[in-house]
């Protein structure tokens, strides 16, 4: 892992790079849970996803949202965080003479981070750019206006989530005819269920080149 800061619109953004730098199969942009409730890029769900995508051969990019770690600024409940993730992705695309710009990219997030990634996808789509896939875990559908997502998005939610009730995510997914993978017995933070979460992602990628 390497950590560094890059220029953002309101000051530095702290990012971490994990995995394959030389010849990755793609780039994963990974977003953490709500910063005002202790969310950081070192959250256990986030690091589980990071390790899973590293195992799959990706370059994984995490960043701290505004006001967390070495990232400047104050929490904006979505708009500024969306801008910052787009800044991070653009920075990665311009690294090493643009070697990563032509690779597939994945947008992944947990809780508040999933909400932000849904809006990152909308902004990118307006530029004609589309992720290889999205992975949204414990999506904060009961607390923020989560945008519609592509039909192949992997949505994972805990059966016993009392932070974001499963029903709210089902209600969000239903009009989109979007499947939701429910982990029996899992709470919002997937305590004791992180290996299951990892296997769900690995299985979703099984057979992909």
Predicted regions and their residues:
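Serine-hydrolase catalytic machinery in alpha/beta-hydrolase-like enzymes
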Residues: 6-8, 12-100
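Short alpha-helix in the alpha/beta-hydrolase fold that links the catalytic acid
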Residues: 149-151, 165-173
